[in-house]
């Protein structure tokens, strides 16, 4: 992982390390250059078209599409239409973990946190 591409911006506050970005960008503009961070990120497409790349895999986002970017995955976004708008929700994966050692924690959440598993990037409703 290239250290120089690590995003160092603090997300939210110490008490609430969640940041929601309302993104509206010019077509063809590089809205978010390639970077990675320790947090998980959810992108929710609202309008227009977005070109995004996650770990060298290209995706096209359209209204209603949801993308999950795992912690430490290299990613970047670029508007592909004049009316491109999306929400980017950045949060620590630990928010999904519980203090209990239950089956969901052991089989699903801990492997995500330890990078032994990952959530697929494009979440399809069907």
Question: What spans do the regions from the language model cover?
Answer:
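A hydrophobic/aromatic-rich effector-binding and dimerization subdomain
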Residues: 1-19, 74-126
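A generic fold-level signal
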Residues: 13-15, 37, 53, 61, ...
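Conserved short histidine dyad/triad with adjacent acidic residue
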Residues: 20-37
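Tight coil/turn sites that cap or link beta-strands
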Residues: 28-29, 64, 72, 92-94
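Short, conserved beta-strand element in jelly-roll/cupin
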Residues: 35-53, 68
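Structural motif
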Residues: 49-51, 58, 74, 95
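Short acidic-glycine-tyrosine-enriched beta hairpin
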Residues: 56-71
């Amino acid at each position: 992982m290239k250290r120089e591409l690590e995003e160092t911006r603090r997300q939210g506050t110490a008490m609430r390390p969640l940041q929601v970005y309302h993104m509206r960008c010019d077509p063809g503009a590089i809205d978010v250059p390639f970077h990675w961070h320790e947090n998980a990120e959810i992108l929710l497409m609202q309008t227009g078209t977005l070109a995004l790349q996650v770990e060298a895999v290209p995706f096209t986002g359209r209204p209603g599409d949801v993308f999950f970017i795992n912690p430490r995955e290299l990613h970047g976004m670029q508007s592909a239409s004049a009316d491109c708008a999306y929400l980017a929700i950045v949060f620590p994966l630990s928010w999904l973990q519980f203090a209990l050692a239950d089956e969901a924690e052991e089989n699903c959440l801990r492997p995500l946190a330890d990078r032994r598993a990952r959530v697929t990037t494009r979440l399809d409703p069907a």
